């Protein structure tokens, strides 16, 4: 059964995560406040960051950079900037 949360990213009620998949306090914050829809949007941005900035998930410093970008995107309203990327026009 799905659960509904108030998503702080989308600023509305939405379907919450099924379980806490990110560790620690940040993981609890994501589980409590970020919807599946918002998380999917982050995953798209994350993939772009990993590819364009050649981030290695084996490198602790790179993981910290990615985590900070995630916090900025999901909780602080800062969009991910990829140099040279132009989003498709609607």
Swiss-Prot record:
InterPro entries: Fe_traffick_prot_YggX (IPR007457), Fe_traffick_prot_YggX_sf (IPR036766)
Keyword Iron-sulfur: no
Biological process, per Gene Ontology: cellular response to oxidative stress
UniProt GO MF annotations: iron ion binding
Pfam family name, one: Iron_traffic
Keyword terms, alphabetized: Iron
UniProt keyword annotation of Flavoprotein present: no
Annotated GO CC locations: cytosol
Superkingdom to which the source organism belongs: Bacteria
Assembly, per entry: Monomer.
Function statement: Could be a mediator in iron transactions between iron acquisition and iron-requiring processes, such as synthesis and/or repair of Fe-S clusters in biosynthetic enzymes.
Family to which this protein belongs: Belongs to the Fe(2+)-trafficking protein family.
Protein known as: Probable Fe(2+)-trafficking protein
Organism classification: Bacteria, Pseudomonadati, Pseudomonadota, Gammaproteobacteria, Enterobacterales
């Amino acid at each position: 059964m799905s659960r509904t949360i108030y998503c702080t990213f989308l600023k509305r009620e939405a379907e919450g995560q099924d379980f806490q998949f990110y560790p620690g306090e940040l993981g609890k914050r994501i589980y409590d406040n970020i919807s599946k829809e918002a998380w999917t949007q982050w995953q798209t941005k994350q993939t772009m960051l990993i590819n364009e900035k050649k981030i290695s998930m084996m490198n602790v410093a790179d993981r910290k950079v990615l985590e900070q970008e995630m916090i900025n995107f999901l909780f602080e309203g800062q969009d991910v900037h990829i140099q040279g990327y132009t989003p498709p026009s609607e």
